[in-house]
Amino acid sequence: MVDVPALVVCLLVPVVGGMIGGFATAKEIKGWYAGLKKPWWNPPNWLFGPVWTCLYAAMGYASYLVYEQGGFKAQAAPLAIYITQLVLNFAWTPLFFTLHRFDLATVDMTAMWGLIIATIATFRPVIGNWALGLLLPYLVWVTYASALTIWLWRNNPAKKGKKRA
């Protein structure tokens, strides 16, 4: 039997968290980010919202499947790892778009990448291949986004009067 309130919370936390980050940085995307030198393989801006929404929903559903197997008490370690990577995910947006700190955004994303692997590894014994099916696209996208972040860092030197490593 589906625990509807738990499912709704598990889905809404990542999706709404991502939406808040997106709305909070919309001005920077149209201003600062638009002025950056970008690689030919940079996706169009309109693609980020739908991709992240799907990924957030998938990870939320994966967390629900784990939660369903005994709640926080029984699944404390996998859910703690998941929550930690989600916090790092949410932290990346202000590091990159608000503070313009490519260096800190890269460190954040590297730690997040490792924690996504740990999330998959700890979810898999609980929910089987659902963990791979739901979270592997997220890992692939974060790998791509990490490469993009590093490319932007290397190819967009800080402007005079702006602090950036």
Describe each region flagged by the PLM.
Residues 57-97:
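Helix-adjacent hinge/juxtasegments
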Residues 79-92, 106-119, 135-142:
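Hydrophobic alpha-helical segments of small multi-pass membrane proteins
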Residues 43-57, 100-112:
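Membrane-interface loop-to-helix entry segments
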Residues 24-44, 152-165:
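Cytosolic, membrane-interface loops and tails of multi-pass inner-membrane proteins
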Residues 1-24:
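N-terminal signal-anchor transmembrane alpha helix
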Residues 1-8, 61-77, 121-131:
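Helix-coil boundary and interhelical linker segments in multi-pass alpha-helical membrane proteins
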Residues 96-101, 117-133:
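Membrane-helix boundary connector in multi-pass membrane proteins
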Residues 125-165:
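Terminal transmembrane helical module of multi-pass membrane proteins
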